[in-house]
């Protein structure tokens, strides 16, 4: 979305049914996770405003494709994996994982940003080395 001068991301919280997980208050969870990740030093787009009644978040827009789009095009910057691992060095001691899927990352200005505000309790089977890394490989020619 735009105000005529700048672009923004307007994220609408959605409530899809899930048989194996109870989300609780998703808006409050996103806000709590944003603050947690921000305090840890995870690169995030800035949260600019919250419309609680409509469950919407207004975030800074980072121009450019996601890491997933770039990986699909055969483009993997040499430092992306190091940047994700640097995030892990902040997350794991705090007992957290993030969603390491490349659609949740946008490279901008030499920094890989995590554009989702979600984090979860650390579980080794869902950490970067055991789960996320498999999605950060270039497609076979």
PLM feature spans:
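Conserved hydrophobic core/spine positions of the Hanks-type protein kinase catalytic domain
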Residues: 83-90
């Amino acid at each position: 979305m735009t105000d005529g001068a700048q672009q923004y991301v307007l994220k609408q919280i959605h409530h899809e049914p899930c048989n194996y997980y109870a989300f609780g208050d998703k808006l409050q969870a996103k806000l709590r996770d944003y603050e947690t990740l921000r305090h840890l030093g995870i690169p995030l787009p800035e949260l600019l405003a919250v419309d609680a009644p409509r469950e919407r978040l207004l975030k800074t827009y980072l121009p450019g494709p996601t890491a997933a789009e770039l990986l699909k095009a055969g483009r993997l910057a040499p430092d992306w994996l190091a940047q994700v691992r640097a995030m892990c060095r902040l997350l794991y001691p705090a007992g957290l994982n993030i969603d390491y899927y490349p659609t949740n990352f946008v490279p901008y200005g030499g920094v890989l940003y995590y554009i989702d505000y979600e984090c979860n309790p650390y579980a080794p089977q869902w950490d970067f080395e055991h789960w996320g890394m498999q999605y950060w490989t270039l497609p076979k020619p």
